Amino acid sequence: MTVDGQVGRWPVSAIPAAYMRPGSGSFTEFLAGAEPHLLPGRAGAQPAGAAPAVPHGTTIVALTCEQGVVVAGDRRATMGNIIAQRDIEKVFVADSHSAIGIAGTAGLAVEMVRLFRLELEHYEKIEGVRLSLDGKANRLATMIRGNLGMAMQGLAVVPLFAGVEEDPEVDPVKRGPGGGRIFSYDVAGGKYEEHDYYAVGSGSTFARSALKKRYNAAADLPGAVRTAVEALYDAADDDSATGGPDLTRRIFPVVVAITAQGAVRWSDDEVGVVAEAVVAGRMVNPGG
């Protein structure tokens, strides 16, 4: 590295003061002080009623099972009455024992997920320990609250967060049969712990109705995944913004399963087998 014609390290005086200032373990707080323009939703204010036409993600479901918790999402993004994308991914592994699904403004939501992942990594590096599941859920609530201005302009992000506590001593009372917990949020950053199952997005009403009929707390992991895909199928059946399994294009829901051993995204081939079984079953019994 060359500084003033000399090869060496950067002088301390060349490092911005914000980078040298002691702070908390929150990367979001650091970024807000050092480079605030890099945070999601920092665009200038829009006139009332002038929200741009942008892709929106739709339906996400989560349910607990005997081994943990499953999060699944359809692959469709819409822009008004247009299908903006058929294979968007809306469910992500957040860290080793949690996952996040997103509904709402797709661009801001994906950016928020990236920042949330970095937030969890940064905290672990700075503090030397990982956040508890409640701590992760609270950090996400703070990030959503920071997007309130954009939400008031029609660019809302509504995530669904789920996971399993890594350390049983931190959370000795298991919420789900396998220790799985589910958190929903409102656009103002309100955090709510859900029990057994939940869904967000435009097709959530239909998905929750399907989960109410099909949910089985004693189901194993494959059974829970089947229930999640069935719920997304029902949502797609009644909600035009939710995409069902596309056997022609081989586009299937994104599924992440979280157990005490960790969070694992199921491959398209694995989900495809489940989706094909669901479609075959609906050929015989369309109502499920």
From Swiss-Prot:
It is an enzyme of class 3 (hydrolase). InterPro entries: Ntn_hydrolases_N (IPR029055), Proteasome_sua/b (IPR001353), Proteasome_suB-type (IPR023333), PSB_actinobac (IPR022483). It comes from the Bacteria. GO terms for biological process: modification-dependent protein catabolic process; proteasomal protein catabolic process. Residues 1-57 form a propeptide. The keyword Protease applies. Its main location: cytoplasm. The active site is at 58 (nucleophile). Its EC number is 3.4.25.1. It catalyses: Cleavage of peptide bonds with very broad specificity. Pfam families: Proteasome (PF00227). It is found in: Cytoplasm. Pathway: Protein degradation; proteasomal Pup-dependent pathway. Keywords: Autocatalytic cleavage, Cytoplasm, Hydrolase, Protease, Proteasome, Threonine protease, Zymogen. GO terms for cellular component: cytoplasm; proteasome core complex, beta-subunit complex. The formation of the proteasomal ATPase ARC-20S proteasome complex, likely via the docking of the C-termini of ARC into the intersubunit pockets in the alpha-rings, may trigger opening of the gate for substrate entry. Interconversion between the open-gate and close-gate conformations leads to a dynamic regulation of the 20S proteasome proteolysis activity. PANTHER family: ATP-DEPENDENT PROTEASE SUBUNIT HSLV, METALLOPROTEASE TLDD. Belongs to the peptidase T1B family. Component of the proteasome core, a large protease complex with broad specificity involved in protein degradation. The 20S proteasome core is composed of 14 alpha and 14 beta subunits that assemble into four stacked heptameric rings, resulting in a barrel-shaped structure. The two inner rings, each composed of seven catalytic beta subunits, are sandwiched by two outer rings, each composed of seven alpha subunits. The catalytic chamber with the active sites is on the inside of the barrel. Has a gated structure, the ends of the cylinder being occluded by the N-termini of the alpha-subunits. Is capped by the proteasome-associated ATPase, ARC. This is Proteasome subunit beta. It comes from Nakamurella multipartita (strain ATCC 700099 / DSM 44233 / CIP 104796 / JCM 9543 / NBRC 105858 / Y-104).
